[in-house]
């Protein structure tokens, strides 16, 4: 599992040892999820530069507002490799590989390291979480938004089911077996260590899918309980999470793997988190 330092940096995952882990039983002892107590991160988003600014992002540099959003849409929608839903399994084994154990992946909401071979539907297995819930726009698992690895992550099956298709917001009761995650009737709050990751994945989807090429027009809004509408919230909270939890080495590496070997496009908000505030003011 990953831990965060006092400076807000995410440390490599720590594997199960009796003195480091607190084991919590889930579903009356059927499932055990190992977790550690972690420190919230706080940081201000500042302007960044990347090796891609003079090439990949050259048509976006210097823009703001809708012109920036539209430029990024064109950039991240060009020459993209689209996966089938079955191909997502193997892709996630690359993108979310545990840097300390190449046989494992890191699960999004719990932060645990679990065998790549443990993918499935059982409560103690991991499955493919659509961070932008697939019912929001009703795109299902269709090639395109339903298989875009930039918002698909390995997640514990039980915790994924608890999140369901809820919008993201702060508050609620702590999720049993997944400390740091909270939920209520219409929203889900992930643990502090991945709040920014979640925000940047959701905002990527809102830029990538704008109603062209037969895909739904996905838009973030400042609501919860969006149902099957092609909207996901809560925008004001997502912006806050982007500010407070900046991209770390794991998230940046994941972006590189997707670009280099999987889809061949990037999440611009990992490379330039300050662009969130330039588009959604």
Task: Describe each region flagged by the PLM.
Residues 120-281:
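Domain-level detector of nuclease and nuclease-like folds
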Residues 22-25, 66, 236:
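Intrinsic-disorder/low-complexity peptide segments enriched for small residues
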Residues 8, 115, 276-277:
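A broad, structure-centric signal for solvent-exposed, well-ordered loop/edge residues
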Residues 34-111, 275-281:
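N-terminal module-boundary/linker segments of secreted carbohydrate-active enzymes
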Residues 11, 32, 65-68, 180-183, ...:
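Polar low-complexity intrinsically disordered regions enriched in Ser/Thr and small residues
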């Amino acid at each position: 599992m990953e831990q965060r330092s006092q400076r807000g940096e995410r440390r490599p995952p720590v594997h199960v040892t009796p003195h480091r882990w607190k084991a919590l039983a889930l579903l009356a002892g059927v499932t055990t999820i190992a977790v550690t107590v972690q420190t919230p991160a706080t940081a201000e988003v500042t302007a960044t530069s990347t090796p891609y600014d003079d090439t990949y992002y050259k048509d976006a540099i210097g823009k703001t507002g809708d012109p920036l959003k539209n430029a990024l849409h064109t950039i991240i929608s060009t020459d993209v490799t689209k996966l089938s839903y079955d191909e997502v399994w193997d892709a996630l084994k690359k993108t979310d590989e545990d840097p300390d154990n190449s046989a494992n992946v890191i699960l999004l909401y719990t932060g645990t390291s679990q065998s790549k071979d443990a993918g499935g539907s059982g409560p103690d297995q991991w499955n493919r979480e659509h961070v932008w819930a697939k019912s929001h726009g009703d795109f299902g698992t269709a090639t395109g938004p339903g298989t875009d690895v930039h918002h698909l992550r390995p997640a514990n099956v039980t915790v994924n089911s608890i999140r369901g298709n809820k919008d993201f917001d702060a508050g609620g009761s702590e999720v049993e077996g997944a400390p740091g995650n909270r939920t209520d009737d219409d929203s889900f709050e992930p643990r502090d260590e991945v709040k920014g990751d979640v925000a940047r994945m959701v905002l990527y989807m809102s830029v990538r899918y704008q109603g062209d090429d037969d895909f739904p027009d996905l838009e973030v809004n400042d609501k919860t309980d969006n149902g099957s509408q092609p909207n996901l919230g809560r925008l004001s909270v997502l912006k806050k999470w982007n500010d407070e939890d900046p991209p770390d080495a794991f998230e940046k590496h994941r972006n590189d793997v997707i670009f280099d070997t999987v889809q061949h496009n990037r999440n611009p908000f990992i490379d330039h988190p300050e662009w969130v505030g330039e588009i959604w003011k």
